[in-house]
Each structure stands twice: as C-alpha cells, then as structure tokens.
Regions:
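Conserved adenine-binding aromatic site and its adjacent loop/helix in ATP-hydrolyzing domains
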Residues: 97, 134, 161
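Catalytic acidic motif of RecA-like/P-loop NTPases
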Residues: 119-125, 130-137, 153
Length: 325
C-alpha cells in the first residue's frame, strides 16, 4: 500500500497519523480494528514505514529509509502473525527480548523509532498477555506497538486499555473482486476471496492454496445443488463438504464463504457476482438465509469450540429443510 492508496482507503487513519508525525506525538501502542475486509497488514506496515520516513510525514516511498523498509531491510521491526493461530508465550518472550531496555541500549543503531506488529491480537490468551503487559505499558524509548484485530470484543481489556484504538475502513468488495479478476483469478475464487481480507497480497496467497481451492469447489457444488432443491443442498453439505474438507482453516473458509452467499441473498446483492442468478432465484428465502448466516458467523467466531464441522453442517441442513432443532 503506497501513500496515495493509504490516503484513499484509510483517510481517517491517514489524518491521525499525519497529525501525530507533525506534532511528534506518536502513541506507544495502536490497536487497529474493523471488519475482516480491512487492510490490517498493509496499514500496519505503512505506519511502521511512516515512523522513520525522512519526509517527516506519511511514508513517501522515495527516501532511503522508505526504500530500505520496502526492500525488507527492517532490523528494528518485528511482526507476529496471529492469523495463523494462537499467539504463543515464546512469541512474546522473543519480542520482549528484542526490544528490552538493555538490548536497545547495547545496540548502535541510527533509527528514529522502532516498531512491531501483532496481527489478530485477539489470539493473545490471558496467560500470554501477562508476559507482555508491562512491556506494552512501559516500552523501550522510541518503540511503537501496532496491534490489529477483526474481533475487537475478544481482545483482552488489559491490552485494549493500553492502546489508542482506531477503526479502519473496509476495502470495497467490488474493488477487490475486480482486482483479483485482473490478476487472473477466476470468478468463483474472486467471489469468495473478495470478502476474506483487505490485504491484497494475503488474498493472492490464499487464492493459490490447494485447501482453499478445494473449499471453493465444495462451496460451488453446494450453491448449484441449492439451486436444484433443499434436499440436494443438504446432500452436498454432508458429502462434498463434510467428507472432503479437513482442518479448521478449511472449515472457517467454508463457513465464511457460505455466510457471504447467504448475506448476498438477504440484500439481493449480486451485481458483480458469478452467482447472480442463484442469488435472485432465492430472493424468497431471506428468512432462511438470515438464520443460516447467523449460524455460520457464530461458528467462525467461536472457532467451533462446542461442535464439530459435521454438527454445524447438520444444523445448517435443518435450517434449509425448515426443521426446528
């Protein structure tokens, strides 16, 4: 994300950051929050790049500092990716040791500010958070923390209270969809990818994952079966999905993809969708679509803590068949 894109897609954050740079009042810790379609990683990296930009304002992308950062030369930057699972205590200890007072004082560096990013900070559990709270509250001089989350209600209060919270804007879905198509992804993959993240590099990576491709195949088969009958849709759930998808990542992709489809039915939004005819066909099933999307969204948020994948699919099947649980 360059300067122009940052200002275009995140105008509020751009204003806050510009004012902070001009007034030399950078927060010790930021917590960026919003929907999954927000550009969490790209915005975080842009903030980190801005902190040392020689222009004194938003990252220019032209000075030596910006060029080094964009080239991956970032000795005083660290990133923990909580999107891939729970953040472990060892991750925080490594981070704390890197930026401890003694290690900073013993290094001869030419930085203005150091920074670290923790993506999906809601994946920090209480026992892990205890290892970083003092470090977050009393950081080494010149150190800025940048945390992100798409589930702010799940971020521990002890962490939230130590951060300046800033809501990000979601990247328009049609923009992501069209960009994915331009980059060579097919319409089915682009339909589901465009609602998964606002970080385009991440979308490209997911779009090439064989497990994601298997998930899209199961989603596509379900939608085509649903167009035929509710019974065929349930059969597809219990065969194409339950038998072929494995692992929590695939399960959450499947829940999220189906939820997006049902929400499009609810609002009759198929303007750029390969499933436009299907969405229109089920315009009378809005109540059913609403119940289904609620179930699927809850399943993602709770990470299937109390029910198996087949159990969730069975509950979805009951909704489609209008059977009370």
């Amino acid at each position: 994300m360059d300067r122009d894109e940052f200002i275009k897609f995140e105008p509020r954050l751009a204003t806050i950051l510009q004012n902070a740079m001009e007034n030399k009042r950078i927060s010790q810790a930021y917590l960026l929050f919003g929907s999954p379609r927000c550009p969490f990683e790209e915005a975080s990296l842009f903030i980190a790049q801005t902190l040392n930009c020689e222009s004194g304002g938003l990252a220019c992308g032209k000075c030596d500092s910006c060029k080094r950062f964009m080239a991956g030369v970032r000795p005083d930057f660290y990133l923990i990716d909580g999107r891939i699972g729970l953040i472990k205590k060892d991750d925080i200890i490594t981070l704390r040791d890197k930026y401890s007072m003694s290690s900073v004082e013993n290094k001869k560096v030419s930085f203005q500010r150091m920074s670290y990013v923790i993506l999906q900070a809601d994946n920090i559990l209480q026992k892990v958070a205890n290892a970083m709270l003092k470090f977050l509250e009393e950081p080494a001089p010149g150190l800025t923390a940048i945390l992100t989350t798409s589930n702010i209600e799940r971020v521990l209060p002890t962490i939230r209270s130590r951060c300046e919270e800033i809501r990000l804007e979601a990247i328009p879905r049609d923009y992501l969809y069209n960009k994915l198509i331009t980059d060579g992804f097919n319409h089915e993959n682009s339909y589901f990818l465009s609602d998964m993240s606002g970080d385009f590099n991440r979308l490209e990576s997911i779009g090439q994952d064989k497990d994601f491709l298997a998930t899209v195949l199961a989603l596509d088969k379900f939608i085509k079966a649903y167009d035929k009958s509710n019974k065929e849709a349930v059969f597809s759930l219990m065969n194409d999905a339950a038998d072929r998808l494995k692992g929590s990542t695939c399960y959450n992709w499947f829940y999220g993809g189906l939820s997006r489809y049902f929400k499009d039915i609810m609002v009759q939004d198929g303007q750029f969708s390969v499933y436009k005819d299907s969405i229109v066909k089920h315009s009378c099933d809005i109540e059913k679509a609403s119940k289904a999307s609620v179930l699927l969204d809850e399943s993602v948020k709770e990470s299937n803590a109390n029910m198996s994948f087949t159990g969730i699919l069975a509950r979805l099947g009951l909704i489609l068949l209008n059977v009370k649980e």
